[in-house]
Amino acid sequence: MPSLHASPLFDDFDLTLAPGHRAEALGPLFYEEQKETQQTWAIPPLLSHTLDPATDSEEFDFAYPLFTYDRYGEQYRWQIFQLLNHSGGPTQLETARDRFSLFPFYFQQRSSDPSQNYTAVLPFYGHLKNRFFRDEIFFVLFPVFGETRKKDVVTDNYLYPFFHLRHGEGLSGWQFWPVVGHERKEVTTQTNILDEVEVIGGHDSRFVLWPFYMQRISGLGTTNQVWQQASLPAYDLVRSPARDQTTILWPFFSRIDDREKKYREWELPWPFVVLARGEGKTTTRFFPLFSRAHNPTTQSDFYLWPVYKYNRFQSEPLDRQRTRILFFLYSDLIEKNTQNGTARRRTDFWPLFTHHREYNGQSRWQALALLEPFLPNHKSIERDYSPVWSIWRAESDPKTGAASQSLLWNLYRRDVTPASQKCSLLFGLFHYQSDTTGKRLRLFYIPVARSKAAPPKL
């Protein structure tokens, strides 16, 4: 099928890094792409739509992040600037569930299981389930009264956060913050998935005129009972079989003896001067001049923070290294698979370029890159905004031998495969193509040269 090359007015071409085809028009202002089973069309930076029948998924962005719509199977969610949102669809336990929120004033859920329905109008009256890190929340004229439940622990708040009563399995407590408070949990047991009985440690905590006197004993009934007492900022003491910590005039002086992780640490004051020595941790930090810290799996260094920062994490088969200069101005991330010797790498130099190479050797180079260094691998940014400022794009796939380069939204474009080569320049006024059938040259859209491929030798 013949292709039209008149970029940046219009161009269409095969994809380099995946099976598929792409058409672009009016420079960066419109494109349509078929990538394997995924179909995308967009009018950057205003809107984009992606549909994948193979996964039964759909995505739509309008002035991202102002409005987004996402669907996977029967589950869907749309939102307007994360303040107004609606989601729905079946779950593992419900044939249908719909949620609607106008944050932070109105929350609603309707479910095929009536026990999961709720409505909340803040601050007047409401009941929520599985929201805000709590199993249940009930309130009346919040902060006058609010009740929360997380597993078996129920907390009744009156004039939050000043007074509360708390109870649960083996647990009772109360507080009149910041004047006085006390809470105690007895040692309890539970049966795990292996039908084994596990001990859940208890605790006992109290405070008077917080934060001037606080004391807590945790891990009651276990082999690592922890005692802690503090009167901030005067002192903070922690004693346990695994770890001792002494802090005087926080944050000016702290000493840590961690017998479990096998290191000792001095902070004077934290976080500016930190010294740690031992098998489990070695740190020398004089912030912001320099810092070197490492343990058996992690390394973290900086010099003239935030001018230079280096981090490394090693856990077979992953070896991850990242070098940064001035936060996001320059970033170089390398992730190696130590078992098979493959690696991927991403380099960002804001706002000039971004380059990444995958484990399979595929690479992509883009200039400019205004948001990509801050939000790497972000689908909406790549769909909606990258085409607007990517004045240069280069892609290559060493396994297929395919490569492509594009300047100024295909004002110049070159595509190469092992069997063909195409080059187009200046709205298609110059166009050269060669393949197994021969070579062709057009100037000002007029064919001026054509040659047939030589027949194969017998």
Q: Which functions belong to the PLM regions below?
A:
Residues 1-458:
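Outer-membrane beta-barrel proteins and related beta-barrel translocases across Gram-negative bacteria
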